[in-house]
A protein has these predicted regions:
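Glycan-recognition and catalytic cores of secretory/periplasmic carbohydrate-active enzymes
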Residues: 1-402
Length: 402
């Protein structure tokens, strides 16, 4: 079973046509204004300005986090998908200008990350666990694929492939390479998509390497010791990474507590988990890997039978934005991140491709109509990052999810 391309499906009327129009006409332009810091009353993005600085066009200072680039990449992916639905010359022109910035910011060896280029260039590849270099790369790859499909233009695809090649030179089984894997999973699923588009086997092999290595060594602990146990976020020495914002051991939080083929129960940060499971299921589909697929089946069954809310959302605690334990589904403290619901759809679609059974299609529909749509306001300008099942107006701390 293969997915139809977005451009091969035309929605002409009804419920989903209204949502499609909302995305095309309101959400994408509004997010463009946010990325350009034109919307008052919200935290500034500076994402585009960061690329202007990195490209040598602006003398301003970097603003944001190590993962700031990913916001722009997600917008570019949305634009690429939108252009597969209908032509929009003005939108395409804006995207092309952004892609020129990406090209100018990319380093000679393919490396591309504005935070590490502008703020801590000496620390590139030194904190894979916390700093999202590989996560951002994954979102760039997905954006490049979508934009290539939407326009036929390959400039951003060449940028993405150059970055993927840079990563391939840095990570792998060879003795002189780093024997690690992404702290925040995302790159793995993107590499499989890149293989599907380019038919370059090296991208599939790199995705396999990241999945196969996870949980088999002490890479994250070793790099933690090398940086003298300093946390990126607090700049202070800590006993364990990530403990600042979650209650779980970081091995489970980051899903490297076991090799992936031994993992049978969903645990840790929900978005990281389902992104990884998506890549696992996609690799199983490509390679006929029964052992990997068996693990995916156990993980999917665990989530859908024991760790999912009635509305199809996942992640029952804001502490680590995470899964907790079987049947622990409180309504007053759940997190239910919108990204996690989308990731669960990605995972479930790959399971549908593998098994071709209606339970997977039904689950996609169930999550889409409930846990995903709840994250987007009907005006296209208001969003829920997390989706509380229950919230008292006087509980200001719960309002932080809006």
């Amino acid at each position: 079973m293969k997915a139809l391309e977005i451009g091969n499906v035309k929605i002409t009327s009804g419920f989903w046509k209204e949502y499609q129009e909302l995305i095309l006409k309101k959400v994408i332009p509004y997010q463009w204004d946010i990325l350009n810091d034109k919307v008052k009353g919200i935290e500034k993005s500076h994402a585009i300005d960061n690329f202007r600085i990195a490209a040598g066009i602006s003398n301003d200072k970097f603003y944001g986090e190590a993962y700031q680039d990913s916001d722009l990449y997600k917008w570019l992916e949305a634009v690429g998908n939108a252009l597969q639905v209908e032509n929009n010359i003005e939108l395409e022109k804006k995207a092309d200008e952004v892609i020129d910035l990406l090209e100018g910011a990319q380093e000679e060896d393919g490396y591309l990350n504005t935070y590490f280029k502008l703020v801590e260039p000496e620390k590139k590849w030194s904190n894979i666990l916390e700093c999202h270099e590989l996560y951002c790369a994954g979102h760039l790859i997905e954006a490049a694929i979508a934009y290539y499909k939407g326009t036929g233009k390959d400039k951003i695809l060449k940028i993405a492939c150059k970055l993927a090649d840079c990563i391939n030179e840095k990570f792998g089984p060879e003795e002189w390479k780093m024997h690690g894997y992404p702290g925040h999973q995302e790159l793995e699923l993107a590499l499989v998509k890149l293989y599907d588009l380019t038919n370059e086997n090296k991208y599939l092999k790199l995705a396999e390497y990241f999945i196969d290595m996870r949980g088999t060594n002490q890479f994250f602990e070793e790099e933690f010791i090398k940086r003298k146990r300093i946390c990126h976020w607090t700049k202070c020495k800590v006993e364990e990474p990530n403990r600042r914002y979650n209650q779980f051991p970081y091995q489970e939080y980051n899903q490297f507590h076991q090799p992936v083929r031994m993992q049978k129960k969903a645990t840790g940060h929900a978005v990281r988990a389902v992104y990884m499971y998506t890549a696992m299921a996609d690799l199983a589909y490509h390679n006929g890997d029964k052992e990997l697929l068996d693990s995916c089946k156990s993980l999917w069954d665990n989530i859908t039978n024991k760790q999912i809310y009635i509305n199809g959302s996942i992640g029952s605690t804001p502490s680590g934005e995470a899964f907790t334990k079987d049947y622990d589904l409180p309504n007053d403290t759940n997190y239910s991140e919108t990204c996690a619901a989308l990731g669960m759809i990605f995972f479930t679609f790959k399971m549908l491709q593998n098994f071709e059974q209606s339970c997977y299609a039904d689950t996609i529909e169930y999550i889409f109509y409930n846990a995903v749509l709840s994250g987007l306001g009907l005006d296209g300008e208001h969003f829920f990052y997390a989706n509380p099942m229950e919230m008292l107006p006087r509980r200001r701390d719960r309002k932080s999810v809006v």
